[in-house]
Amino acid sequence: MAVEQIDKMAAKAGEATNKWIKPQQPLLTLLLLLATFSQLPAVCSSSILDAASLQEKDPLRDTSMNMIQRNYMVMHSASGSGDHSRSLKRANLANTSITCNDGSHAGFYLRKHPSSKKWIVLLEGGWHCFDVRSCRSRWMRLRHLMTSSQWPETRDVGGILSPHPEENPYWHNANHVLIPYCSSDSWSGTRTEPDTSDRENSWRFMGALILRQVIAELIPVGLGRVPGGELMLVGSSAGGMGVMLNLDRIRDFLVNEKKLQITVRGVSDSGWFLDREPYTPAAVASNEAVRQGWKLWQGLLPEECTKSYPTEPWRCYYGYRLYPTLKTPLFVFQWLFDEAQMRVDNVGAPVTPQQWNYIHEMGGALRSSLDNVSAVFAPSCIGHGVLFKRDWVNIKIDDISLPSALRCWEHSTRSRRHDKLKRSTEPSTAVSHPEHANNQRHQRHRQRLQRQKHNNVAQSGGQQRKHNHLSKEEREERKRLRQEQRQRRKQRRRQQQQKKANGGQEHRNKKDNSPKSSNGNDQRKQRRRQQLTAEERQEQRKRRRKAQQQQMKMQREQPAAGVFLEASAPQKTRSSNNASAGTKSKKRHRVPRVPEKCGLRLLERCSWPQCNHSCPTLTNPMTGEEMRFLELLTAFGLDIEAVAAALGVDMHTLNNMERTELVNMLTQQAN
């Protein structure tokens, strides 16, 4: 049923595109590009909406495949030298019937790493529009989120799509894909024909179609073509909701339909919203906006979720209602005091104690909604979006950074784990459904029983073979082999005795007395030792001891979280006759497969905003200046004099305290 619907949508989309798309004017496009990118507005991208990815007709026909490969070759050959060559390169979709809101070509940005089987696909965010009025307003204010006519040829994105290891310690060398947001439907729409209710504009909403088409067109350029490939579908804000709604469908498309040996995971950043009563009544309630948007976009929702809400399927746009039905592993990052949630709740920038009280309750409600999430990272901060920010490595909970927690979760969801994570972390999150939360314990028990059974069978088989009588031919063959072994051993001993008789000196390894330990390598080492003077040998020993001490010191001082670097053993350098000055041994740094300190469920213990050291700074909405921490506490309605008395300090000392010191004291008091 769903496949037939999508076939019709694709056919209609081709006709509609030819009818409505307008030729682009190069000069006007250039002027719009310069004007737009000189001052891009900071868009609050709350992803309250999305719908599932679709089962459309297979786009990988021969002609389409040739076009995809040509696009990739053009992008690959256009890369120059320097930092510009590391940028993400633009590619339009080969299926031109799938478009942005205004009918312009949808597409993606790609930076391919030839030796990597990992793919990071990032869905952009940017709010949504849900009726004629809101879409017109969006077109006037945020046109770059509804058309591709202003897209540049290259993009540089930080965070999890950064190619720099200091900014992206674990995924800097993966294949990176950015899908710009131009459908205004939180990646959920399937409307291929223009909305006839708006006579002035002709909007299409194809977010789910765009995502599926991009994934399909990545296959010819390497996605899942090698066994053991991995796809991490990540999204921020509207993209975060898009990840949750499309994750299972994308996995089914790759694994079941395309028969690819690939592991699919999802990461939702700031896309987890609540349908609460707003602080003040808005012109259109958030629930009503979601319901209207679902109809306008013709959104497809996951069937497993809509079964739970048959009369109100649009409820599946909320993460806490959708999550229990997911089968593909999902990692959730969410600020406990999300700015987009505040916008949805119409609370505004927190200034008064009443606003702070409402926000405090909002944080508690959001924390409770994450109870059944098996992999979560939720700092007690006011913010929105983090995965694309260049300082995302600084966000920490309990000394575990966000990239480290994400890396731990990535390894915990692998089918075969032969590392320390299997013993040191919380239960695995390989399946996100709450009914399977304890399956890992039972699986380990079954594996133990199977190993015991296998060992018993092997032992019984060995005993049986031992008592069986060998035939005459088998006994003779075994006897012949033993005699040959004895002859070889005797011959080796005669050769060794002959060397000794001829005056050759053999260096015997005290740890291994086998004949193999005396060979040409030992003789060469002995000659080199004889050539060195006593002072040079002593200098060599000092250098080796110093290198070992430095290595042990680095291992002791290695941090428990953040960017984990471990030094390899110092390189051994050959000494020459004139090598009297010692050279420092070079150390090769590498990132370990799993951080030393892991955690799969990291929720901030304190319940008030900005109590985390790594929270983003706040600005006063009235003045635009950065708010001091005491100002924030005052706005929160706290009695500062009472706080000073509780901490045992005077007001002068309290006012002069640094933010980190004050947060430490308050956190210790709270604990």
UniProtKB/Swiss-Prot annotation:
It catalyses: [Wnt protein]-O-(9Z)-hexadecenoyl-L-serine + H2O = [Wnt protein]-L-serine + (9Z)-hexadecenoate + H(+). Residues 1-46 form the signal peptide. Keywords: Glycoprotein, Hydrolase, Secreted, Serine esterase, Signal, Wnt signaling pathway. Its EC number is 3.1.1.98. Residues 570-583 have a biased composition (Polar residues). Residues 470-486, 505-514 have a biased composition (Basic and acidic residues). Transmembrane segments: none annotated. It comes from the Eukaryota. Induction: Expression is induced by Wnt. This is Palmitoleoyl-protein carboxylesterase NOTUM. It comes from Drosophila melanogaster (Fruit fly). The gene is Notum.
